[in-house]
C-alpha cells in the first residue's frame, strides 16, 4: 500500500537525463527557452515531495474505499477530489496539455505521473482526463471543444475511458462491436 511511500528518483533522473533524448526534445520550438536539462532534477524532486505529501497520505484509504456505485451515483474517496484539484491548480494535470508554449513534454508528464502513481495507485485515473481532453482537442468539433475543454483544463470536469467489452480490455483489435453514424453527427448506433 502507498502510505509508506518510498521512491528513489535516481533511476528516473538517469533515464530522463542520460538515456532518453530529453535534451533534444527541449530544443523543439514548443519547449525551447522553457526547460533545460538542469531543470529536471528540481522538477523531479518537487514532484517527489508532492507525491509524498499530497498523494501518499490517501493511498491506503483510497485502495480500501474503491469506487462505489449506488442508486445511479458513482462515488470516489473524498481524497480523489482533493488531490485532483491540487494537481489541476498547480499545473500537473490536464491544465498542462493545452496547446500553448511552455507546457511539459509528454515524456516528463509521464515521469511525473509515475511518481504520483507510486504514492497513490488509485490516483492514476486522473491521467484519463488528459487523454480524453487530448482526444477532443485533436478530433472534436469546435462546438465540442468549447463545451468540454475549458472545464477539463481547469479541473472542473474529469474524463474517463469506457471499456465496453470485457474480453477486449484495451486491445482495440479484439473489439467486436461497431459504431455507425446517424443523421445526428453526435450520435452513433
Language model segments and positions:
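Glycine-centered flexibility sites
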Residues: 91-94, 101-103, 131, 140, ...
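Glycine-rich, Trp-frequent "lid" loop and neighboring beta-strands that shape
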Residues: 143-189
